[in-house]
């Protein structure tokens, strides 16, 4: 709707200087996702070329794969667009074929839906993990959809591309791994007899996801660092690749749990400010006046995180989101009157 990045949106809520903290936080999250996907790439290459020697071993492949993925992010939005034209149709076809093979191989829908995983999760833990898997992308959504021609196109792209298509791909992955009993997707694809083509498409899926992760991380950092976006892409990409090659993907579930609780309060504060306090009226460009730091926004965000991690009833993601919205609304309507808690002022030039 606003046509700006998440970091720009945060300027109105957290302040001109405060938004830099949010930019760094989101950059760390997306760089972390980059590292995780680099690890998955290494696993896929190892499964694809088990006799390829050290060059296709999991951690070495993760390193050179991360460097290659950095190229399209370096090219910017044009690079993302070119790769997506190739990858998206291939991923859709693989998902449909994978679901059909999984269902048929398991004896039908009833049989596959009755499969019990070796380590089942509780409903609340599952929801937190799901929110964690979506939270990073949701936070970065405006970084991608800001190029949409209007608000309607942005919403349609988000609903169909992210909520519907992405959910179907995740469901397809679950059905394939459930049908084979393999938790590692590359191994599961091979176990189902989908072959090398499936692994190549899986690599494309990882690539298209990861160049977006690095692109978004660079946008977040460019909001607060005096360097060009290209330099930030290279430095962030190399550091995230090293972390990924060291095995961050081995802690994937823990990573999702952290994101599922920590990111919703950031969104909660921005949503509350935009819809409930500012009436969906944000201004940008020369002459726009921002506060430097909105202390109430940070207190609400941190309060939501604390509640999400410490309150053990209900669903942690919803608890942290709701707490941040309520806290921010109450603080701004009471203590926030008369610019209390609003530190400094800065005019956009």
What are these model-derived regions, one by one?
Residues 60, 64-65, 69-102, 117, ...:
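Membrane-interface loop-to-helix entry segments
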Residues 23-26, 50-75, 89-98, 122-138, ...:
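Transmembrane alpha-helical segments of multi-pass small-molecule transport proteins
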Residues 267-349:
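C-terminal membrane-solvent junction of multi-pass transporters and transport-like membrane proteins
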Residues 19-53, 207-223:
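Hydrophobic transmembrane alpha-helices that form the core helical bundles
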Residues 102-105, 114-176, 190-211, 291-304:
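Hydrophobic, membrane-embedded alpha-helices of multi-pass small-molecule transporters
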Residues 73, 89-116, 126, 130-134, ...:
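Hydrophobic alpha-helical segments and their helix-loop junctions in multi-pass secondary transporters
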Residues 1-13, 23-29, 333-341, 345:
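Juxtamembrane transmembrane-helix boundary signature
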Residues 43-52, 65-87, 143-149, 216, ...:
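Membrane-water interface regions at transmembrane-helix termini and the short interhelical loops
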